[in-house]
Amino acid sequence: FSTAFDRVAYSVTGSAHPSEMYAAELGEVGDRKLTGFNDPVLAEVELPTAERILYPSDDGTQVEGWVLVPPGYDPAAGPYPLILSIHGGPHGAYGNSFAFEQQLYAAAGHVVVYTNPRGSTGYGEAFLWAIWGGWGTLDGQDVLAGVDHVVANWAIDEERMGVTGYSYGGF
């Protein structure tokens, strides 16, 4: 907020655009883009937008995730290789924000799935602590159910699937 508390500046991101700064006047409709750090690069590349998915895990628990397909994705041209990306934590979470790594994989022709299994933040205390004392159990089921969901709904080559992760996601 400004010192007069009538303006706010904030960062905006999405799966197909890195963060930029915006400002808005309180009580007004609309906002104003303050930065364009990424505009020159974005004018030269095609970045796909991730699709949000909700799918049931083995026990029926609803899990949120995102699927990012290669630019120009055409199911008839598939099947495509798949990469499962697992976040750190376990008390971390993916969101609808720009992820260079996922965009890089998609640009190389892979479908990328990244999910928020049990243990992730943002879904309540029960979801967060469901894996306490059991890392790699329910959360493992959740990410594998996400892979099954993507294989069933996108043109995926089941002989070319891989997994990547960092910190807890590499566990």
Where are these regions (language model features)?
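Serine-hydrolase catalytic core recognition
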Residues: 1-171
